Amino acid sequence: MRPNILFIMSDDHASKAISAYGHGLNQTPNLDRIAQGGMRMDHCYVTNSICTPSRAAILTGTYNHVNGVTTLDTHIDNRWPNVAKHLRQSGYQTAMVGKWHLGEGKPHEPTGFDYWSVLPGQGEYFDPVMIEMGKERTESGYATDIITDKSLDWLNNRDYDRPFFLMCHHKAPHRNFEPHPRDRDMFNKKDIKVPNTYNDDYKNRARAAEAARMRVRIDTKYSDLGLVQPEGGAEVGDLCFEGSTERRIPHPEDPRGLVLIDRHTGENFTFETQEQLAHFKYQRYMKRYLATIHAIDENVGRMLDWLDEEGLAENTIVIYTSDQGFFLGDHGWF
């Protein structure tokens, strides 16, 4: 009997934030079930580690200079052969649910799938619009839960006489990190260990390391950390890029006049030193990131439980991966 294939992918999930890897940052018991029951990849690298090119490479099995999807802004030509097309031709039922990020419209929408329901672009964490078989519809709830609900709904309504191939793609934990309200406070009782290289001065490193605009200390946005962005211009923070309305949180030498406000609770945060501010940014970033991952682990557990209940676990290949990893404060980066 040919095996079913369940392919689950998240976005920007660092291996350090999976407890099966032993780093102690968080607990992911359901992801660990996959590792314990199969193979854990310890040396797996992305050749073009940004969302769109990585997804194109996974889908087509080709390098980006071959499939043409070389940047975040290039879209896939959906006439390309892909894994779903090959499997469907051999008798599999195929479905794609969640983050696509390879372009919208007829030339770029998913092909090779009997059913698809995808987020446009990055999509939203709460009440996301989804494009289902070419038609937009707004779904109520939290994206990680919704993507799992829709995946399970398709599985329950498929043809049970044929094997299935399901690509379940989560938006989480991509910036801006938005944990479900049930998870927002789960890491608040203790601090996350700061990496030894968090304050890297980049001496004796390549110039690109110092130039990279992804430092937790100076490049995090208000929205990254669940903070209110004040009204105003450059005095409340530099624009993230030309044309953006989002601003970076300031990192002044003397932060005693800086007040940051929690977007959810209204709590105010003040700082006496620059190092205290840097520590706050790291803790806030990490706790929101890890809390966002918690919902992924819970929902992976729902899918594994479904396989057990249906008696399909032994004949289903389950793969969990991310489109790329993430820096968790290592060398000061996110």
Feature map (PLM): residue ranges:
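Formylglycine-dependent sulfatase
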Residues: 1-334
